[in-house]
Structure formats: structure tokens, C-alpha cells
Amino acid sequence: ERFARENSTADRQFLLAAGSAGIEAATNLVVHEANRTMLLYVYLAVTLFCLITFRSWRATVVALVPLMLTSVLCEALMVFMGIGVKVATLPVIALGVGIGVDYALYLLSVQLHHQRQGMSLVDAYRQAVAFTGRVVGLVGITLAAGVVGWIWSPIKFQADMGILLTFMFLWNMLGAL
């Protein structure tokens, strides 16, 4: 748009693409702009619900930092694999955040319970991992096992999503533990 605006003259006019290429370009532009907005809303909602659930800003930060790291690493993996942010890939990062906060809810709720009963941070963490760590590990591995087979799909989108989802499920699990 900027190029057409800056370089069009009375004798020569640059028009934006039409047909499939134009629609794809316009869609990509909207998706690119929507990606950051979507992540902002997702993280605001997760922050709000963590604050309500845990009643602790520290616990909220502990839950959010691994999720944000996973989002950044997922986007880096997408760049490395040559996967663009498209309408079909846009929800993947949000899904990873939703699954990741689930792991954090399991562990932090038990840890905070033990801390409120007077346990030290280290002992409360050990108790939380002993009590719910196996469940978090089982859920993470089960979710990853459900999509890891997609990696060998002849459908490129499905194979790419298999890699991304497997990565996000396992990385979020490790981040929570």
C-alpha cells in the first residue's frame, strides 16, 4: 500500500493485487496485526484468572514466565521451520498458553496450600511435585503422544502442527515442573 501510494503518478498507477494473491496478502496483513493483539488478550485473561485463583502476584509471575518463554520459543521454532503466522496457525500459541497454565494451576495450587500451612518454599515445592508432578508429566506426555504422529503426515500443515503442538505440550510441562 505504501509503495503504491508513494510511487503512483498521473501516468503510472500501482494497484494492489487482486484474486487469490490479493486476498492472501490482505489476510496475512490482518493476521500479523491480530497475532499480538490475541496474545495480549490471552495473557491478560490468564493473568487475571491466576490473580483470582492464587491471590498472589508472585504465584502469577511464576505461572506466566514459563508460558511467555514457551510462546517466544514457539514463534522462534515457527521461524526456523518456515511456518508463517496464518489464520490456521494463529490459535496454536494461544492453545499452548491455555494448556501451559493448566499445568501451573495443578502445581501452584498444591504448593501454595502447603506454604499457607507453614511449609518452607522448598518443602512446599517438593510436596507439590511429589503430589501432582506425576500427573502433570502424564498429562503432558499423553497430550504430546496424541499429536506426535502428525509429524509424519504427508499433509504439510498437519506435520507442522504436530511439531509445534508436541513442542508446546512438552515444553510447558517441563516449564511447570
Q: What is the role of each PLM region?
A:
Residues 47-51, 72-84, 133-177:
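Hydrophobic, glycine/alanine-rich multi-pass transmembrane helices and their short helix-loop junctions
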Residues 95-138, 146, 150:
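Cytosolic juxtamembrane regions of multi-pass inner-membrane proteins
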Residues 20, 24-28, 57, 121-129, ...:
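Alpha-helical membrane-protein architecture signal
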Residues 1, 48, 52-64:
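C-terminal, well-structured subdomains that either form a transmembrane helix-short loop-helix hairpin
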